Amino acid sequence: EGLTGISHVLEHMMFKGTQKVPGGEFSRIIARAGGRDNAFTSRDHTVYHQQLHKSKLALALELEADRMVNLQFSGEEFVRELKVIMEERRMRTDDNAHAQLSELMMATVYAAHPYRTPVIGWMSDLENMGLADAMDWYKTWYAPNNTTLVVCGDVEAEDVFRLAGKFFGAIPARTLPQRKPQVEPPQR
């Protein structure tokens, strides 16, 4: 509780740079390689995706592995990005009657399950979220054993496995928190 929207905040922060790749450069590197990238957060997962020529697969995997473990957290950048997300919330939800209705419906329909909270987060949680919260979330959940790598296109499976091992293989697994089942009470 109190951290609704944290996954979405991390999605934004994942483009702010590592020791190896300065802030804002991730997308530029992909673009210079002839590709495009983006990300989105849903209720169950966050997706980071690149679309580029198969000859650039190693580049994409190297960049993803780097930001999985080497993300740089700047307090200034975090505050700036939180303001962007709060404005995004105002524009997409607070100023949109249909979005407000949908948000209220989910909060009513789900009494116990996390689906009751908006992906973007409640404004009060965003206003009170700190850099340490984001760092803890990143250090807890961003790990190869909590990641699904999907590669599709004209590629050889052996090449994908080899490159995935090369870039992600040295990243240690993390002990993930035990997830507790969220059982909804009967509704009448």
Predicted regions and their residues:
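Non-catalytic beta-strand/loop surface segments
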Residues: 1, 20-56, 92-146, 170-188
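Active-site SXXK
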Residues: 5-18
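Hydrophobic face of alpha-helices
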Residues: 7, 23, 27, 61, ...
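Bacterial peptidoglycan biogenesis and beta-lactam-recognition machinery
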Residues: 15-18, 69, 74, 155-158, ...
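Non-catalytic accessory/assembly modules
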Residues: 76-80, 96-103, 155, 162
